[in-house]
Amino acid sequence: MRSSGALKSSPAATGPEPAPTPADSVDAIPPAAILLVDNGSLEPRATLALRALAARLGTALGQPVDPVSLLHSDRVPTARLGGRPAEILAPALERRARAGRNELLVVPLFFGPSAGLTSFLPRQVSALGARFPRLRVRAARCLVDPAASADGRVAGMIADHVRAAMTGSGAPPAVILVDHGSPTPAVGAVRQHLAGQLAGRLGSAVRAVLGASMERRPGPAYAFNDPLLAQAFDRSGFGEGDVVVALQFLLPGRHAGPDGDVARICAAARRRHSGLRPATTELVGAHPGLVDLLADRSREAMTFAPLQA
């Protein structure tokens, strides 16, 4: 098996294949520059956590991994990021293309196929392709693929965090799996897929598992995000006793974190329901298994066809 840095070349469409020269050899192609890409946040802790995760992934892969955000993070003051400005995707791709780094690998730090990956990323690659025709950008798969039902690694990470958050008071807790919320139905389907996997993994150790979101757009077209977390606590069985809020979040930000919206919603629910004892889990980004999954996604994507320029 070739090393993860080797990219497969495409055979000629017609005629005999010429003998490889050093310039044509697959092994002569330099390793791709790897970008670990998240959505971006105005919260400095998110960028700092992304950098730490990229460093761990780089150690696992044996080559540097650059932390990059789709948007937003470049608006965080550099002084709050240790004096090093955040990178966002479009200028990050162009900077590397100008430097002659023609082989790029985008590793999404996303649970599912958000519009940032299915629309924004291809548009950026297409815009650059006209100016840098040798540029080749490959993209790894998201962390969760409902079509690959046998892959339960993310659900396993969340289950580990739920078990760690359980109080051991006796009665099984209820679990609310909460994500950011999305206008994209396929992203909502990932949350529900994970909720089903989580229920299967936890079994009789919990009394129920419910998927919920932090936010949604108005209108019935976005009802797949329901219930919102604040409403979930008002459902039967979720407003009393031990309830573990399982964070389907990768990095700290406005919603997730010790002083985020999730914590405030839990505190408000506790005031409404006197017998409620809510607890929250660690972020998925804190689980050591995430680096292994990202490394697998990275190696797999080295053989993918480049995005169309």
Sequence positions of predicted segments:
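Extended amphipathic ligand-handling, pore-lining, and cofactor/metal-binding catalytic surfaces
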Residues: 1-309
